[in-house]
């Protein structure tokens, strides 16, 4: 990021099922509509994945399409309609604007992202669809009639991590290959230290671990109605998360206060990062200028050595006179050139040459220096 021009960005990334909603989205209307028991549907889906050596996400996407045949429309609009019926945890609907507004007051840009193996079309059917900068979720390809015909995007717990790198680098399009390019620290749009990942289960572990290991914030949430903390306890023991809290998104509740503290900390920390960046930049620029300066001296010495006319020698010495910090080794080399190159040697008594060489030989003591002083 360019610290001179931009506010720091905090990216808050969410799983969906059991993180923002108390249950799997498919289990809140769709599975029942195709005449299946929820547990039976998932058992069959998992068995298909096992028998066919199939990705579990692809398995349930296949089952959804297959089981809907002759029972319900399997279209984009129908899936969005199922999504509109998905229940959300308390406080979720006003959470995103509230947290974004809090960030603005703290001088931080807050962005919300979904990274879920759930179904994008259902998420887009909820009241939350416009709250996210990007929704990264599994999705279908639809024909001209809006009927799902093939998986378009499949997201599982391992490939979720690529989207964190996309967010970090600001390369958000899923087909943008620049995500594989090298970015320097100052080019990163959202450094991992400013990424928050909120999830509920072991399928979130790769993302949580990645965020944690790079200095970000991983938060495990649990259903406040059941108060079952077994998963978050295990994730905490295994160093997968930094914090855990009930999935209660209402204002002034534990999760709300925790995320606000992270935003405040980010605002302060980025001031220090800005100072560090500017100090580092100054040193790099200084080193670069020094390197250019040293190269200039080397080039002038070589030019003097290769000078093939009196006129050229005068021009080179004019440039050399503007440099004050010749090293002892460089000065001795200049003395040697003055004695060896006839285009320098025969004009030693010229005023500009003489005054320059008098300055160069000051404090030096050697046979070459003595010979040169005799000539000038």
Where are these regions (language model features)?
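Alpha-helical substrate-recognition element adjacent to the catalytic core
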Residues: 1-144, 235
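C-terminal cap/substrate-recognition subdomain and adjoining C-terminal extension
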Residues: 90-113, 117-333, 346-351, 358-376
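Amphipathic alpha-helical segments within extended alpha-helical solenoids and repeat-rich scaffolds
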Residues: 338-344
